[in-house]
Design a protein with these regions (language model features):
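Bacterial Sec-dependent N-terminal signal peptides
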Residues: 1-17
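Sequence/structural signature of beta-propeller domains
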Residues: 13-340
Length: 340
């Protein structure tokens, strides 16, 4: 759970070709977007985006139209277009969605520990489409798959476990601070029968050691950039018993898998194992204040439009837990980046 009250973006000194141009303040559209548990988003074209809700036991996804300025990248308005498709089971806890072809999307289910391909714009379920899963025993509770991204350059589908797998240690906490070790997992979409390729990813250390009521630290989403690099969204959410003082630290990193060394998914961690390099693109921290309830637990991220000058918009969406207590909102945020 994450509470937002203020936001500051910090640019990092890195040697990657992507840099931050500007951020826009988060916005909610309570009059046009109904409360939900929106945890993933992907573009469908013509300013339409599909979003999954991790609590939906009926609709597969929900379409919205986002009106984003082609000059500045600011999100101007959002329009709800309604539910689409139907789920093939209950308690799927769908956390991420990504378009992988003109007619299909892949959805990451935390409840089923799987990634599964679905047809767009239909209520029928084709069980002959691609599906992949891992044993539930590999994961700690609520730390499964929260991410999905598709690289159109190299035709790869990406995901990552939200926090440390059991074989790799324990998830970091405020009382046991350490670097979570994750497995970035890539599937060759031109040869889907091939075994996935994985890479070791090391998260940053926790920024607090205070006692908490709720503490969540993990990668909440991936996004493939137009050149095949990956954006990795690290999220640290700290909530004390009194709620005041709660914060969420979000860090957006760029990773270039093309220059990294794979590490087998089923291989135990060994001393000297290769971790991918990461470069900080942006960082923001949000807090719960006495009078401001700008909660924004960002769990969805995807490419937005390119601006008239060629800059790239990144769209983020938060999970309001269905407008929890009438206070939390479904926030949207856009940032603009540039390849130099």
């Amino acid at each position: 759970m994450v509470f937002f009250a203020c936001s500051t973006i910090l640019c990092a000194q890195d040697d990657s070709k992507w840099s931050l141009v500007r951020e826009h303040q988060q916005k909610s559209f309570a009059h046009t977007i109904p409360p939900g548990n929106y945890s993933g988003i992907t573009p469908l074209g013509d300013d339409v985006y599909a979003m999954v809700s991790d609590k939906s036991d009926s609709a597969l996804y929900f379409n919205v139209r986002l009106y984003i300025s082609r000059q500045t990248g600011e999100l101007l308005q959002a329009e709800y277009l309604g539910p689409q498709g139907r789920v093939d089971s209950v308690r799927l806890d769908n956390e991420a969605i990504v378009r992988v072809s003109d007619s299909t999307v892949v959805i990451a289910s935390e409840g089923k520990h799987r990634l599964k391909e679905y047809k767009l714009d239909t209520d029928s379920i084709d069980n002959g489409l691609w599906e992949w899963s891992m044993p539930s025993a590999d994961f700690y509770p609520n730390y499964v798959f929260e991410s999905a991204a598709y690289d159109t350059v190299h035709h790869r589908l990406w995901t990552v476990n939200e926090s440390t797998l059991r074989r790799d240690g324990k998830p970091a906490t405020t009382q046991d601070p350490h670097n979570n070790v994750l497995r970035l997992i890539a599937f060759d979409w031109s040869n889907r029968n091939a075994s996935p390729v994985s890479y070791l990813y090391k998260m940053d250390m926790p920024t607090t050691m205070k006692m908490s009521m709720t503490y969540v630290m993990g990668v909440s989403e991936l996004c493939a950039l137009p050149d095949g690099k990956l954006l990795v969204l690290e999220r640290e959410a700290f909530i004390p018993n009194i709620k005041l003082g709660a914060f969420c630290q979000c860090k957006l990193y760029v990773v270039d898998p093309e220059v990294e060394t794979p590490y087998a998914l089923d291989k135990e961690l060994e001393p000297g194992a290769p971790y991918v390099s990461k470069r900080l693109l942006a960082s923001w921290r949000t807090k719960l204040g006495l009078t401001k309830y700008l909660w924004a637990n960002y769990e969805g991220m995807c490419l937005g439009p390119q601006l008239e000058n060629g800059d790239q918009v990144i769209v983020l969406v938060s999970d309001s837990q269905d407008g929890y207590a009438g206070v939390l909102k479904d926030w949207f945020k856009t940032i603009v980046i540039r390849k130099r």
